Amino acid sequence: IITTLEQAERDRIIINSKKYEERALAPVVSAMVGGSPHFPSGYRLKKQTDNFIWISYDTQFTSQGILIYKYPVVAGKQMMGLDEILEENAEMLKNNVPGMFENTYMMTSTFARPSIKYMKYKGRDFAEIRGFWEVYNDYMGGPFVAHAFYNQDGTEMIVMEAFVYAPKYDKRHYLRQIESVLYSF
């Protein structure tokens, strides 16, 4: 029953996201990964490189962000395992998501090992990773959920990671909102 309720809420958020979509973001993401989630109004592009995009919805007290990145598949190497995904994730975060101070950057928390679950949604196989992020050498952190999957021709891994920073608030609602954006891909 809980899964059914979560799916109904996710579908409601996706419908709303499509209705009030921040349309300028779709071409940016599509150019890099061949498709795009539906970003609700208010989301803004924070950073873009050839293989990395950071999109965020920020308020005075909260931040909901989505990191989208890709990297080449290495022939003969397991690419969908948790350790392999986290290894690439560590490099992407360190190079692209700086903290507020020198020698600070976003990283996957080592406090609790993230979990991985293999799923199929709308015909797409993907690995869902859940865990916590933190800022190296600083006191920020929160939950994240990521979807990792192969591109259409199987030559690249694509990772879409949704994260929440809301130090004064319960993060469940914020995470479910932004997780719905991932499912709209």
For each of these PLM feature ranges, what is it?
Residues 1-16, 37, 43, 157-185:
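Surface-exposed amphipathic alpha-helical segments
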Residues 18-47, 183-185:
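N-terminal "mature-domain start" segment
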Residues 28-34, 42, 60, 120, ...:
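Long alpha-helical, hydrophobic tracts
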Residues 83-101, 105, 171-185:
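Long, compositionally biased interface segments
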Residues 95-154:
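Signature of long, low-cysteine stretches enriched in small and polar/charged residues
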